[in-house]
Each structure stands twice: as structure tokens, then as C-alpha cells.
């Protein structure tokens, strides 16, 4: 992305995410969602792709989002609010693609995610996290189709990019861009991140600031 690396956006993003971020709500069902407020951005991805770690790295708080070595632990929509004047809310979505999950649990997660995507007017973008070591999987493609149908803008974010050789990463980026060309709701540019090193976090923060500007927040 080009605009998102504007130094002004980078600095504004740094200030917003250096503020007070805190957990506000956990929703196991669509009926228990918090009232809509501000601009929401959600993070989706396969189980253990690193969603919670990325949210912690973004906000500089190691324990804001609970991390787990147990795939599929996050079964709720988890909401985090930042500084009041920022008007930005983060949503940690349930991980998908956990093979050991029961059919009933998968159906419940799927229903929750679909209803959330289709009925949340304040949801401005979904960041779909992809493990940079593995690239897109079939279950990721299913989520992209769901997002297309919901007409929700989304962007691919590679996690754990520091654990992939540069040549392999470039191949996965090229392959992913080819796939995204067929998805109308997809933002064309990818973001490379590492929660361990902090790489890509300034750019991701800046992207969200630009989104706030576009929405007039």
C-alpha cells in the first residue's frame, strides 16, 4: 500500500495505539453483541494464526487479547475499545478451520460470523490473517467468499512473516494476489507482519487511521 505508509498516518497510528486499549465485551451469540459505536475493524483467521498476538502487538499490551496454544479456544467475538476520541474498536473473531472441533461447534461459529458480517453497519473492514509460512488454505478461500457475499471490505495480512525465507514469502504474496484478483471485496494490497519483531505494525496501524479518515470518524 502507498498512502498507508505516509509518515503522518504512521505517527497518528502510533499515538492512537499508544493510548488506553481495553477489553469491553465478549459475545457468544449475535443477540449479545454490544451496541454499535464508532468504527469497527475485525480480525479473522484460522485457529492459531496469531490473531491475539497481533492485537497485543498492535496495542503494545502483551495480555490485552488472551493467547492460547489450544486451537479453537476463542469461540466468541471479543471487542476492544481504544482511546475515546479515536472512535476505533477492534474485534477478535473466532478462529476457524480447527479440525478437532465438533460439527455443532463449527456450525455455531459459522452462523455467528455470518450474522455479524451481514448486520454490523459499523464494521468498516475485516483483516484476514494468513500464516505466512503456509499461505492461503481452502478454508481461507471459504471465508473470502463469505466476505464477498457480505460486501464487507477486507484485506489480507500475513502473520509470522519473519519465519519465512524472503523468496518463499514473495512466491506466496504473488500467489495470493492472483487469488485476490477474483474477489471483488478484497483490498488489492497485502500487509506483512510479525508480532514477534513488530514488523508491519506501523503500516497496519496507519491503514486503520486512513480507514477512520475515509469514514469521517
From Swiss-Prot:
Protein family (similarity comment): Belongs to the TRAFAC class TrmE-Era-EngA-EngB-Septin-like GTPase superfamily. EngB GTPase family.
Cofactor: Mg(2+)
EngB-type G domain ranges (all copies): 37-214
InterPro entries: G_ENGB_dom, GTP-bd, GTP-bd_ribosome_bio_YsxC, P-loop_NTPase
GO CC annotation terms, alphabetical: cytosol
Pfam family, one: MMR_HSR1
Name of this chain's protein: Probable GTP-binding protein EngB
NCBIfam families: GTPase_YsxC
Function: Necessary for normal cell division and for the maintenance of normal septation.
Gene: engB
Keywords: Cell cycle, Cell division, GTP-binding, Magnesium, Metal-binding, Nucleotide-binding, Septation
Gene Ontology biological process terms in this record: division septum assembly
PROSITE patterns: G_ENGB
Sites where the protein binds Mg(2+): 52, 74
Residues reported to bind GTP: 45-52, 72-76, 92-95, 159-162, 193-195
GO molecular function annotations of the record: GTP binding; metal ion binding
